[in-house]
């Protein structure tokens, strides 16, 4: 199926036999596994040049253009090991056994793929922080991939040896993909400002939060690059929001459900912009796993919900906030010049201790890259 994909699929087991049934084809593999494939599924995934444009490797065939009761006229295993299907409308399809096995949807194949799916490594105070050298990440794709896998699975990483010139962050972020611009710019400077338009641009304590919860899609990755940090105070604290959500689910399941099921509004009220988004603090994916944490108390609108739910929701919200402060979850470090944080902003909450701007200069630069770009880059590097 090379024409339909840029990846290659190893031959785990050859096809031993194939037979049609009323609505599809059943194949038996040499290792004994049996996989059914339905007619519409097979026709929908035909990789031939008439069904897939070989230049873009994108499908041009539409399954709605064939009868829903399309039938197999003949099925064989070709000399090259492919599954060959002759359709009753005269079309022919051939499927590479490696591709077919990788996409089989019998119960055993689905279970294998679920077990091999990347899983988040939840962490607490004792995190063994993944640390990488900036030069190696910039020059070596294997190191780049190792770093990106840590960002994906752990959610918090640090780089050393980053040049301390303003803008040095841009080439690093672009090793992944393009930078996501916001109303704070392509790059944003984190330092104390007299006319601050965000609490981040002050010197006082910044509580644990995710950035831009006011957006429909929060930025996936956040970079914070230290150019100079001579001020007293200003340590960084991180917590794994997924670990806290799991602890809350076990310790207070009713509170967990409220934070998953109840949407609340977040607002960013600037002099020149007004961003608003309504979403739950804890978002789940289709399998019930935590997909996203959305929390910044200083960007939260007054709660609006049924009066009977309000008291319990406040208890749940307070419980989550209190858990972010518990030492068992908190990982605290000071970032020095030439070092950089890269973390999953939709999972990891970050905070900053107050600092004394009169004691020395403190200048960070930051930017965002969407999580989709991270996952795409990983898949390309793994080809």
Swiss-Prot record:
GO terms for molecular function: gamma-butyrobetaine dioxygenase activity; iron ion binding. Pathway: Amine and polyamine biosynthesis; carnitine biosynthesis. GO terms for cellular component: cytoplasm. It is found in: Cytoplasm. SUPFAM superfamilies: Clavaminate synthase-like. Its EC number is 1.14.11.1. It catalyses: 4-(trimethylamino)butanoate + 2-oxoglutarate + O2 = carnitine + succinate + CO2. Catalyzes the formation of L-carnitine from gamma-butyrobetaine. This is Gamma-butyrobetaine dioxygenase. It comes from Pseudomonas sp. (strain AK-1).
């Amino acid at each position: 199926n090379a024409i339909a994909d840029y990846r290659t699929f190893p031959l785990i087991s050859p096809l031993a036999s194939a037979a049609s049934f009323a609505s599809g084809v059943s194949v038996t593999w040499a290792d004994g596994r049996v996989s059914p494939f339905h007619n519409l599924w097979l026709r929908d995934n035909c990789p031939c040049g008439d069904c897939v444009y070989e230049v873009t490797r994108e499908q041009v065939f539409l399954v709605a253009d064939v009868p829903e009761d399309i039938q197999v006229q003949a099925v064989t295993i070709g000399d090259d090991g492919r599954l060959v299907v002759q359709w009753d409308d005269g079309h022919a399809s051939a499927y590479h056994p490696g591709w077919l096995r990788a996409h089989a949807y019998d119960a055993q194949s689905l279970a294998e793929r679920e077990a091999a799916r990347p899983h988040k490594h939840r962490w607490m105070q004792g995190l063994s922080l993944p640390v990488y050298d900036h030069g190696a990440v910039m020059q070596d794709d294997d190191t780049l991939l190792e770093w990106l896998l840590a960002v994906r699975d752990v959610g918090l990483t640090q780089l050393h040896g980053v040049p301390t010139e303003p803008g040095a962050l841009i080439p690093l972020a672009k090793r992944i993909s393009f930078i996501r611009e916001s109303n704070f710019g392509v790059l944003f400077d984190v330092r104390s400002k007299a006319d601050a338009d965000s609490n981040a641009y002050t010197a006082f304590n910044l509580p644990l939060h995710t950035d831009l919860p006011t957006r429909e899609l929060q930025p996936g990755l956040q970079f914070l690059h230290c150019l100079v940090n001579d001020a007293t105070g200003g340590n960084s604290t991180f917590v794994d929001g997924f670990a806290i959500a799991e602890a809350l689910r076990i310790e207070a399941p009713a509170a967990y459900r409220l934070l998953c099921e109840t949407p609340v509004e977040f607002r960013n009220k600037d002099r020149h912009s007004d961003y608003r988004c309504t979403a739950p603090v804890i978002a789940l994916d289709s399998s019930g796993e935590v997909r996203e944490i959305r929390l910044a108390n200083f960007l939260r609108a007054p709660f609006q919900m049924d009066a009977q739910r309000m008291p319990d929701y406040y208890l749940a919200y307070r419980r989550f906030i209190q858990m972010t402060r518990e030492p068992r979850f908190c990982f605290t470090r000071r970032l020095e010049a030439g070092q950089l944080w890269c973390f999953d902003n939709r999972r990891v909450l970050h905070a900053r201790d107050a600092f004394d701007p009169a004691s020395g200069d403190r200048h960070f630069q930051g930017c965002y890259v969407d999580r989709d770009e991270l996952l795409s880059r990983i898949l390309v590097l793994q080809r």
